[in-house]
Amino acid sequence: VATLTVSGGIATATYAGAHPFKVGYVAQFAGATPAGLNGNKAILSVTGTSVTFAAPGVPDGAATGTITSKAAPAGWQELFAGALANVIALKPSVVEATGCVLRVDDTGAINARVRAYEAMSDISTGVGMTPLESQAAGGLWWPKSATANATARAWILVADARGFYLAVAPAGGDRYTLLFAGDIASLKSGDAYGYLLTGNQ
């Protein structure tokens, strides 16, 4: 962030070049004084080199400090970090979540393998697995690329604290596979199993 100024309760962050934000995105600012400018901020407007966000109670003027910004984290917790190369276990960290765990095995060249568990005791062991081995041996498939090469593939991730959509274009172009993992709005109050995992069999 090159400059950060406040006027009338609206903060404007200006960048030396382009930025990744769009209206409605949540950015995480750090390093600013006054401290009320730090934290997760919903983006109100954008130009090619600036963004604005609400700064209620912050006095007008220029902020000081080494100010940084990045996309705000969605609030998922990594379990068993570094326990197995190219394998990750994630679960929502908010207290109202089901607590179900997503396990992603990203060792394959063109597909990742995914499973969900009610709980996991280590990176390879869990209870309440879905899909069952009898339903999809090895888990569901999440496509990454149609070919095993270094060609970049477009992807989009939209996440909140309880679930995320992942859209991947494995063959390139604008044909995406839409995937989901996370809690759903259950019709049953207090549904401890209101979790959905999609993928290919």
Predicted regions: what they are:
Residues V1-I10, H19, G31-Q201:
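Small/polar beta-strand repeat architecture
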